Amino acid sequence: MSNVHELNFLKEKIQELKDQGVYRQLPVLEGPNEAESILNGKKVINLSSNNYLGFANHPRLKKAAIEAVEKYGVGSGAVRTIVGNMDIHEILDKKLAEFKREEAVMSFQSGFNCNAGTIQAITEKGDLIISDELNHASIIDGARLSRADKTIFKHADMNNLEEVLKANRDKYRNMLIITDGVFSMDGDIAPLPDIVGLAEKYNAMTYVDDAHGSGVLGESGRGTVDHFGLHGRVDFTIGTLSKAIGVVGGYVAGSATMRDWLSHRGRPLLFSTSLPPAAIAAITEAINMLMTTTEYTDRLWDNAKYFKAKMSQLGFNIGNSQTPITPVIIGDEAKTMEFSRKLLENGVFVSAIVFPTVPKGTGRLRCMVTAGHTKEQLDRAVETFKKVGEEMNLL
């Protein structure tokens, strides 16, 4: 007889999700993550992937990964501070710094633990973290791990941010303003020039999580800082290596001092095995490609503008997105989930985003258009949206 707890309290919570119509099961992808993929045994147009540039199954990245496995093996075998810091890790960090036009970079195992580890390492008791209210969960968790005080400012509200800075400038040793570069649920871009201007006025540091800006905005995907021409004015820039780059990992770009400190106090670096050689090699190849051509980012933006125009013409509410992220805002959580299920039945996979990821009453289908989509695929997706929208009396 098992002594494992029944976890009835969790069963009750799961039943609540089912009663609310927001319970979901993990979809199973069979094969590579591409514009058309096999999901749960069915071929679908994939509008849910963060694979912005189509790099996740690119032959050049796969070739680089295979060659790295043959030379270095399948794993690094240790944390970076012991014997898991291979020469290719150092090469990647230097390549990323060159790409981002920063002095130095430290790469991490994921974007999430990059935020969680960096925020905790660069702040302490006597500091103040000032965070946009819509920042990513990894920023929230990173701030929770810090001993610094925390406060939020209204989303992209510069008047409110200045009020917070003015009220606290004499109370703390350091103030750190944290913002997403691109907000993942709405696709809007942070007013970074204004944020940097206020930071300089009140002697605060700036920290930009550019998970959805890296590989998308700026010259050939150099990010939000590059997009606004703010090099040398942002203290910390976070990027992921799993979205536009198509592999896995994250990094923080900034000063050599920052990198040196994180090698001593960045807890994910100290206590978790470093990225495997195959991932490092594939990432390096992706960065090489972005540094030599704008082909992929150009195609991404062309597809995004095409899809947005088609959806707007149908009368869907796509919010105020300024990036390829295209939210189709339904509102009601149960209807949002139903819309997603009906799309899947008709061969289009789009994730339903509902509370608690977004506020109640703002459920949406987050469409992720990529460089890998063809116009024909996007047209089929739009027609499917139209069909389901009419069936549900939403058009």
UniProtKB/Swiss-Prot annotation:
Its EC number is 2.3.1.47. It catalyses: 6-carboxyhexanoyl-[ACP] + L-alanine + H(+) = (8S)-8-amino-7-oxononanoate + holo-[ACP] + CO2. Its cofactor is pyridoxal 5'-phosphate. Pfam families: Aminotran_1_2 (PF00155). Transmembrane segments: none annotated. The modification N6-(pyridoxal phosphate)lysine is found at K243. GO terms for biological process: biotin biosynthetic process. Homodimer. Belongs to the class-II pyridoxal-phosphate-dependent aminotransferase family. BioF subfamily. One of its GO terms (molecular function) is pyridoxal phosphate binding. Pathway: Cofactor biosynthesis; biotin biosynthesis. Catalyzes the decarboxylative condensation of pimeloyl-[acyl-carrier protein] and L-alanine to produce 8-amino-7-oxononanoate (AON), [acyl-carrier protein], and carbon dioxide. Keywords: Acyltransferase, Biotin biosynthesis, Pyridoxal phosphate, Transferase. InterPro entries: Aminotrans_II_pyridoxalP_BS, Aminotransferase_I/II_large, AON_synthase_class-II, AONS_Archaea/Firmicutes, AONS_Archaea/Proteobacteria, PyrdxlP-dep_Trfase, PyrdxlP-dep_Trfase_major, PyrdxlP-dep_Trfase_small. Pyridoxal 5'-phosphate binds at G111, F112, S184, D209, D210, A211, H212, T240, L241, S242, K243. Substrate binds at R24, H136, T357. Signal peptide: none annotated. The keyword Transferase applies. The keyword Transferase applies. This is 8-amino-7-oxononanoate synthase. SUPFAM superfamilies: PLP-dependent transferases.
